[in-house]
């Protein structure tokens, strides 16, 4: 068990800043800056003796914050900012004085940490929507100019919790602890900083649920020595096996955190005795392949529980966490959780995003393994030093990490997540399609803004609507800048398509009537053939499809000609022969179904056939056959455009075909996904296919940067049309996907 620690500088009279700095083994310039800052803070407090009853506590807070951040290997600027933060929070100095003495960078960092207090305005503890709270946390990360502000604030909250009993009244303490539980602990988890996350969680649990906390702590303490001896023996045995096969490996017992134990008990509905990971061991290796070597050794030497295995190396958690988790049975059949990770994975899990700002001066230890990983960050920071008063570098850094998102508020304070560059119309359509259709204006912070205004982080938008929907076609033009997201434009297009139906029906009817007049056909003759072909309910649907261009008129006419017009006597004779052959097809068909189980061609057994590549039909599709020159019969979808052209030219070569009952071969088909261009789109698509056990045979993609659209074509292997419909439906539900269809 790891017990949370209280404030440890209990004898401030004995505290000597110079000795303390020496103990941290800091670079000379960093040490000097911290000493100057400490004396600066002390002198300010001494200047207000009546108001500063908690002066000692404030100085102590600054020192503890520095210690926490130093353990995270934070840089000198971060440490100096932490030392000064208590006097800034208590308004003992002004910004000009700070800027003059400590510089613009430190002043900007201090302002950023203070901005973190705005989280209280969000009142996240009253939100019942988990997604809403998560958006608030993500917005908090993106709002600040420098990630170090977030980490400093987390350190400040930990120092508060360590001494909360002496800092404020009970009611204020409970509110502050809830704030840490709802906002700051999940924030530390999102940043991947395990060292801060577990301490925040355990403190919050101790204050909010003291009885449960004490009960678990007591259970852990009762058999602590026996458990420690058991783990020590297991570690010794396991280390021997591992060192025979892995050059560099470290094995040790892993400390348990009370909150994580309680959470697992609640989640899995277990008693304390039923937990697997009260006894836990961690294996640290240097190379990725050694993780799986170690896993093989562990599973070979000890019986493992398959249901308790998780590979977060191959499938990292959303915050980047990587490790292999497994549970094995040690001596006496006692379960032991084993975690396996590389040193870099371990450092990432403990330091998370703080690793990007690690303090390097005078440090040549194991942290040098991070050099390759953060080289690009160093270049950005060096570039920042060369540019005066420029926020472009940090903006680029934020976009790399947070996928170019902007988080804005509704009038009720709800957070809406949109791509950077979104406009008020994008916001309106994100709320609801009808809000977008009826939008006639927008206010940001009470001020009217144009539709081309690009939303900024933290904007509060009020949409002005009219009674009836009336979107403009100009909104669809990306060059005009009214809309930015593909989803907004798709909703606008859908509205116009629906509204245009009244215009398309008479236009389509006129086009079809003109063509039928040339063929001496009536609409009554055409209706029984045309409606089933396109799966339509009535003639208005047919006219609307022709008028909008969704139904190609020339294809329809070719189809109708093949069904209703016999051009020559020779063709008529051939048609009669085909009908005669069809009369004897039933017995032959039954035989084919039993013996072939594939495609059954009317009246012919065991005839060579192949699937046409132009339309790639699969079981469930309506199909027809076409007699080729020397290659047997090619099987097409009944609505295949290429087949319709062939049929119009040589109708005598067409033979009716159906699927056999036992056709089990895999079919190759092409699908297309059109979506708003975003990071992780291809990963999400392939995940859906993998979950359905669909093989991907080929992928090609292209992007339209102006329209922010991505088009992905894929060749996949399927067995029937039902599974295709299921796949397309799941793909269509993915975020930002506009269309998923078969080609």
Swiss-Prot record:
Pathway(s) this gene product operates in, as recorded in its UniProt entry: Purine metabolism; ppGpp biosynthesis; ppGpp from GTP: step 1/2
Keywords of the record: ATP-binding, GTP-binding, Kinase, Nucleotide-binding, Transferase
Pfam name, any one: TGS
HD domain mapped to chain residues: 58-161
Family matches, as InterPro entries: ACT-like_dom_sf, ACT_dom, Beta-grasp_dom_sf, HD_domain, NT_sf, RelA/Spo_fam, RelA/SpoT_AH_RIS, RelA_SpoT
Record GO biological process: guanosine tetraphosphate biosynthetic process; guanosine tetraphosphate metabolic process; response to starvation
Enzyme class: transferase
EC numbers for this chain: 2.7.6.5
Gene3D superfamilies with a match to the protein in the record: 3.10.20.30, 3.30.70.260, Beta Polymerase, domain 2, Hypothetical protein af1432
Lineage: superkingdom: Bacteria
Gene Ontology MF term list: ATP binding; GTP binding; GTP diphosphokinase activity; guanosine-3',5'-bis(diphosphate) 3'-diphosphatase activity; kinase activity
Residue span(s) of domain ACT: 670-743
Catalyzed reactions: GTP + ATP = guanosine 3'-diphosphate 5'-triphosphate + AMP
Residues in TGS domain copies: 404-465
NCBIfam families in UniProt: PRK10872.1, spoT_relA
Family named by the database record: Belongs to the RelA/SpoT family.
Function: In eubacteria ppGpp (guanosine 3'-diphosphate 5'-diphosphate) is a mediator of the stringent response that coordinates a variety of cellular activities in response to changes in nutritional abundance. This enzyme catalyzes the formation of pppGpp which is then hydrolyzed to form ppGpp.
Name of this protein: GTP pyrophosphokinase
Organism encoding this protein: Haemophilus influenzae (strain ATCC 51907 / DSM 11121 / KW20 / Rd)
GN (gene name): relA
């Amino acid at each position: 068990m790891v017990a949370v620690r209280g404030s440890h500088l209990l004898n401030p009279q004995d505290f000597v800043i110079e000795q303390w700095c020496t103990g941290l083994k800091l670079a000379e310039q960093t040490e000097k800056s911290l000493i100057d800052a400490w004396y600066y803070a002390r002198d300010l407090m001494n200047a207000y003796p009546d108001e500063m009853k908690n002066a000692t506590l404030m100085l102590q807070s600054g020192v503890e914050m520095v210690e926490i951040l130093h353990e995270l290997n934070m840089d000198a600027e971060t440490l100096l900012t932490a030392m000064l933060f208590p006097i800034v929070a208590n308004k003992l100095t002004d910004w000009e004085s700070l800027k003059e003495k400590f510089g613009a960078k430190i002043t900007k960092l201090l302002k950023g940490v203070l901005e973190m207090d705005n989280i209280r305005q969000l009142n996240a503890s009253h939100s019942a929507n988990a997604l809403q709270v998560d958006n608030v946390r993500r917005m908090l990360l993106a709002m600040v100019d420098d990630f170090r502000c977030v980490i400093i604030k987390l350190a400040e909250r930990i120092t508060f919790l360590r001494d909360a009993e002496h800092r404020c009244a009970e009611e204020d303490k409970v509110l502050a602890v809830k704030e840490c539980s709802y906002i700051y602990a999940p924030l530390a988890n999102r940043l991947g900083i395990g060292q801060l996350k577990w301490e925040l969680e355990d403190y919050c649990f101790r204050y909010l649920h003291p009885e449960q906390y004490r009960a678990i702590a007591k259970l852990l303490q009762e058999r602590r020595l026996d458990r420690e001896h058991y783990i020590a023996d297991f570690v010794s045995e396991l280390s021997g096996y591992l060192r025979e096969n892995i050059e560099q490996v470290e094995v040790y017992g892993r400390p348990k955190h009370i909150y994580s134990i309680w959470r697992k008990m609640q989640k899995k509905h277990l008693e304390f005795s039923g937990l697997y990971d009260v006894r836990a061991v961690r294996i640290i290796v240097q190379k990725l392949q050694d993780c799986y070597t170690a896993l093989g050794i562990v599973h070979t030497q000890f019986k493992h529980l398959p249901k308790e295995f998780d590979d977060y190396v191959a499938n990292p958690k959303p915050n980047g966490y990587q490790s292999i988790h497994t549970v094995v049975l040690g001596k006496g059949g006692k379960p032991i959780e084993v975690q396996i990770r590389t040193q870099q994975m371990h450092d990432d899990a403990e330091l998370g995003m703080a690793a990007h700002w690690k303090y390097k001066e005078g440090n040549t230890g194991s942290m040098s393994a991070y050099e390759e990983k953060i080289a690009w960050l160093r270049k950005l920071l060096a570039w920042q030093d060369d540019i005066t008063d420029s926020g472009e570098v940090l903006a680029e850094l934020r976009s790399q990490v947070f996928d170019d998102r902007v988080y804005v508020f509704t009038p009720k304070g709800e957070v809406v997540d949109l791509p950077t560059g979104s406009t008020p119309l994008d916001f309106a359509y994100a709320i609801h399609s009808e809000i977008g259709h009826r939008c006639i204006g927008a206010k940001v912070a009470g001020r009217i803004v144009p539709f081309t205004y690009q939303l900024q982080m933290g904007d509060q938008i009020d949409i002005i609507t009219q009674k009836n929907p009336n979107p403009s076609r100009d909104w669809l033009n990306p060059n005009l800048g009214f809309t930015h997201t593909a989803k907004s434009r798709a909703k606008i297009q859908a509205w116009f398509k629906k509204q245009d139906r009244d215009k398309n029906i008479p236009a389509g009817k006129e086009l079809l009537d003109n063509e039928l007049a040339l063929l001496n056909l009536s609409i009554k003759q055409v209706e029984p053939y045309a409606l089933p072909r396109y799966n339509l309910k009535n003639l208005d649907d047919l006219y609307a499809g022709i008028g909008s261009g969704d139904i190609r008129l020339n294809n329809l006419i070719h189809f109708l000609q093949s069904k209703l017009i016999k051009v020559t006597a020779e063709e008529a004779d051939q048609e009669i022969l085909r009908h005669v052959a069809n009369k004897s097809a039933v017995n032959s068909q039954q035989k084919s179904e039993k013996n072939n189980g594939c495609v059954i061609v009317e009246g012919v057994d065991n005839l060579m056939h192949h699937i046409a590549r132009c339309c790639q039909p699969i079981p469930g599709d309506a199909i027809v056959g076409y007699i080729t020159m020397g290659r047997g019969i090619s099987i097409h979808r009944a609505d295949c455009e290429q087949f319709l052209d062939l049929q119009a030219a040589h109708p005598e070569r067409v033979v009716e075909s159906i699927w056999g009952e036992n056709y089990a071969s895999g079919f190759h088909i092409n699908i297309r996904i059109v979506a708003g261009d975003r990071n992780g789109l291809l990963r999400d698509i392939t995940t859906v296919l993998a979950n359905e056990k669909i093989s991907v045979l080929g992928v090609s993609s292209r992007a339209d940067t102006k329209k922010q659209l991505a088009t992905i074509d894929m060749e996949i292997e399927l067995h029937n049309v039902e599974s295709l419909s299921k796949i397309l439906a799941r793909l269509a539900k993915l975020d930002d996907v506009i269309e998923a269809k078969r080609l």
